[in-house]
Structure formats: C-alpha cells, structure tokens
C-alpha cells in the first residue's frame, strides 16, 4: 500500500510539472502573437484555467498577458484580481518592460473604473521606465492617456503638454 501511494505521488508530481511547462510554453506563444493577433491571443488565454497555474512567475505572466489581450481587443479590464499580483511580482523580479506593461495595464483598469487619480499614478509609474524600454508607441499611448486624464481633472495646461508629447512620440511610429 505504501508503495502504491509513493507511485501515485510521483505520477501526480510528474503530471503537474508537465502541465506547468505546457502553460508556460503556451504563454510564450501567446506573447509572440498578442500584438498582431490579439483576438487569437485572448482565445488562447481563455483556454487556460487560471486556478491550474501554480508558479508565481507563470501566474504573473498570465495575468499581464490576459490584461493586455483584453485591452488590445477593446474589452474593459474591470478587476485587478489577476493584474495586481502581476504588478507586485514584476516589481520584484520582472524586466523593465514587464514593469512598464503591468503599471500600464493597471492604469487602464483604473481608468475604466473612473478612478482617475489612481490611473494617473499608475501611468506615471509606468513612464518611469520610458527611457529603458525604448518603445515610442507605448510611451506615446501612455502620454496620450495621461494627457486625457489631466484634461478630465481640469488640469488643462499639463494635459496639453502631455498630449503634445504623445503626438511627438506617436509621429515616429509606423
């Protein structure tokens, strides 16, 4: 009986490791297509059961990609239940691009829930990485939304400065 339990435990560990590897590989494939095929990326992410993800790094990667896919398909990010852990994880162990994107997505979510002050803070935290990530499009979009947020909060001069900064960044994009 003891041997049977050990064998079952071994196979359970083996299966969970392979599932983890499969999910990580699927997330890598999804990351490669998310900009060109956001609908397909979202569909791929929806096929993954978030509760089956065990590793913190994989959960963070999934939460960020899922939020990006929702944003890129024009859907609202209405909760930070997957995004907040991603922000926390990437602030400790992520690349500068992951840090930028996680703050950016959090800002999108806060903006969509009309929490303009929090959204402004998140976008400003994202822009702390602007010189490091060197992505004029993302930086331009971030400045554009910040400009819009300032206009909504009646900070007109700051809003126009950010909007003009956004236009300069976006004019260099293809």
Please describe what each predicted stretch is:
Residues 2, 6-8, 17-174:
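A "functional boundary" signal
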């Amino acid at each position: 009986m003891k041997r049977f339990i050990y064998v079952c435990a071994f196979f359970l560990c083996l299966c969970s490791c392979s599932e983890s590897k499969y999910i990580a590989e699927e997330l890598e494939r999804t990351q490669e297509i998310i900009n060109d095929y956001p609908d397909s990326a979202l569909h791929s992410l929806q096929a993954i059961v978030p509760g089956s993800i065990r590793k913190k790094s994989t959960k963070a990667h999934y939460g960020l990609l899922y939020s990006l896919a929702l944003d890129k398909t024009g859907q609202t990010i209405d909760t930070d239940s997957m995004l907040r852990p991603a922000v926390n994880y990437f602030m400790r162990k992520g690349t500068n691009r992951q840090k930028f994107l996680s703050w950016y997505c959090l800002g999108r979510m806060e903006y969509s829930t009309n929490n303009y002050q929090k959204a402004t803070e998140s976008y400003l935290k994202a822009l702390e990485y602007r010189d490091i990530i060197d992505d004029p499009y993302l930086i331009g979009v971030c400045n554009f939304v910040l400009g819009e947020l300032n206009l909504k909060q009646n900070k007109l001069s700051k809003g126009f400065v950010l909007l003009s900064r956004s236009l300069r960044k976006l004019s260099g994009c293809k």
